[in-house]
Amino acid sequence: MDHKRGSFSGKIGFVLSAAGASVGLGNIWRFPYLAAKYGGAIFLLVYIIQAMTFGYTMIIAETSIGRMTGKSPVGAYKSFSDKPALRVGGWINAIIPILIVPYYSVIGGWVIKYLAEYLMGKAHLVAEDGYFSSFISNGVSSELCFLVFTAMTLAIIFAGVENGIERVSKIMMPILVVLSLIIAVYSVTRPGALEGVKYFLVPNLDNFSWMTVVSAMGQMFYSLSIAMGILITFGSYMKKDVPIESSTRNVEVFATAIAIMAGLMIIPAVFAFSGGDPSALKAGPSLMFITIPKVFDSMGFGTVIGIAFFLLVLFAALTSSIALTESAVSTLQDELHWSRKKATSIMGISMVLLGSLSSLGYGPLANVTVIGMQFLDFFDFLTNSVMMPIAAIASCILVSRVIGVDRIADEVTRNGAPFRRRKVFNAMIRFLCPFFAAIILISSIASAFGWISM
């Protein structure tokens, strides 16, 4: 059946929804531990430079493709080319969110569990050694939390673009900003935290390495929602009178600012707690669920800060999972002509089935691995390290070789809107973006198989 395509009410609706997609676990969880691991301020500096060039270019390109066609990734690619090899790029963009959102929802379920424990006054419990591993290995508890998070996401998707996604983003994003400011101020004013602030904000060239560059580029996919089909989909919901460059610049600045705030929330606090112990700063993915509860438990008002922090993370996780799910649902609506209700229901079933593999992968299914990885780790590797760089390369080829930079410029400058960084866009989309995406692809695969160390 045909469906009426939804749309955002205006610029603010697009900016907050797209920023909500970007300000997810990638910024709150992944960015701080990568910054801590790869040199602090030097990582931040490299990331900002890349966000202003690589990130800016890809956001403009994907949003423009979506608005030009009014379609989700598969339909957008088909609108410009009938070559099967290139149209595969559209399908890769469409499949990525279908694979990401199930395991993403599992992590969202973990956040719900921690928030519930803090609300019940169990800050000491979650700070105990072995709590996290005990929780995720308990198949029933982990699965229930995952299902609750999934249900929250689907309920918002059922409501539609303006009444669901946009309305929720307008509520959650301001709260997220306020909470991040409160926690960051509290964190940087702890005794001993200023050394952590210095590590995160004052560049030290001795900490620079090639892996700093590669890791910052990889993080950008998460932080700016690049190559996930989200920006093409959200671009298709953007009204023609909304200026693309200023809107996407706002998204870029907003997402980067929240990533910096996340670093200020976490790195100084961990630095103060550990006395600058490098092993604590480089705890990796366990930073949020193992190290941070210990940090909060050692602080005054630790329970209150824990509630605020995990509420913030829950909002961030929800806004991103909503965007990922919407991208997948939009593709099902466009390509199979399903109603929103049917497309959302089918996507929900897929989320439960695939997500359960990741949820149970540390418990009852712990002995089942794919190329030596647990299900969650495998889906993360497949999407982030393989499919997303390929999707980015496909978008670069589509814009530079098929659509043409001039047509993208015409879309960006519609109604007299400016395109101030057109020269940067031209150079990046033709040469540098595909080159860097290829570097990420090769480096990530080499690291996964142990050929290089990241």
Protein language model features and the residues they cover:
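Membrane-interface "cap" regions at the ends of multi-pass membrane proteins
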Residues: M1-W29, M58-T63, R67-F80, P84-W91, ...
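Membrane-embedded translocation segments of transport machinery
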Residues: D2-K4, F8, E166, K170-L318, ...
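Inter-helical loop and helix-membrane interface segments of multi-pass membrane transporters/permeases
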Residues: D2-R5, Y33-Y38, P73-I92, S105-E162, ...
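Select transmembrane alpha-helical segments in multipass membrane proteins
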Residues: S7-A18, I42-V46, P84-I98, L144-F149, ...
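Membrane-water interface regions at transmembrane-helix termini and the short interhelical loops
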Residues: L34, Y38, A85-I100, V148-M172, ...
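Extracellular loop-to-transmembrane helix junctions
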Residues: A35-A61, S141, M387-A391
